[in-house]
Swiss-Prot record:
Source taxon at top rank: Bacteria
A single GO BP: UTP biosynthetic process
Localization per record: Cytoplasm
Catalytic activity: a 2'-deoxyribonucleoside 5'-diphosphate + ATP = a 2'-deoxyribonucleoside 5'-triphosphate + ADP; a ribonucleoside 5'-diphosphate + ATP = a ribonucleoside 5'-triphosphate + ADP
GO terms for cellular component: cytoplasm
Protein's name in the database: Nucleoside diphosphate kinase
Organism: Helicobacter acinonychis (strain Sheeba)
Binding site for ATP: 10, 58, 86, 92, 103, 113
Family according to the record: Belongs to the NDK family.
Gene3D superfamilies: Nucleoside diphosphate kinase-like domain
Keywords: ATP-binding, Cytoplasm, Kinase, Magnesium, Metal-binding, Nucleotide metabolism, Nucleotide-binding, Phosphoprotein, Transferase
Assembly and oligomerization: Homotetramer.
Length: 137
């Protein structure tokens, strides 16, 4: 089934200048980038986007990291886009990620793990709406 999902290329990946390589992974695996923008999240935006993690011990560090530099947010579209994107990203901890996944190849740590991807269709819908107006894709 054709789906849409959100992907965020995080500040660590932008600093390493691997944005193009990450986008190529998506495109060469059947995911089309239908909307994309580069931006610098404010603390408020990062806190609102990651509100589900507010009570978790890593929340403060996550927010500090996500506002430490620019990010690239994208809407990806394709067959089973949510699952395909998650497979391409690999495990949250790059040490546990399978060889050839984005996180295994480009991430430094569980905190600086290169990419974010929606974990369900419902969350994809909400996350896309957080960053993009319908007219943008």
């Amino acid at each position: 089934m054709k789906q849409r999902t959100l992907s965020i290329i995080k500040p660590d990946a932008l600093k390493k200048k691997v944005v193009g390589k990450i986008i190529d992974r998506f495109e060469s695996n059947g995911l089309e980038v239908i909307a994309m923008k580069r931006l610098h999240l404010s603390v408020k935006d990062a806190e609102n986007f990651y509100a589900i993690h507010r009570e978790r011990p890593f929340f403060k560090d996550l927010i500090e990291f996500m506002v430490s530099g620019p990010v690239v947010v994208m809407v990806l579209e394709g067959k089973d886009a949510v699952a395909k994107n998650r497979d391409l990203m690999g495990a949250t901890d790059p040490k546990l990620a399978q060889k050839g996944t984005i996180r295994a190849d480009f991430a430094e740590s569980i905190d600086a793990n290169a990419v974010h991807g929606s974990d369900s269709l419902e969350n994809a819908h909400n996350e896309i709406a957080f960053f993009f107006a319908t007219r943008e894709f």
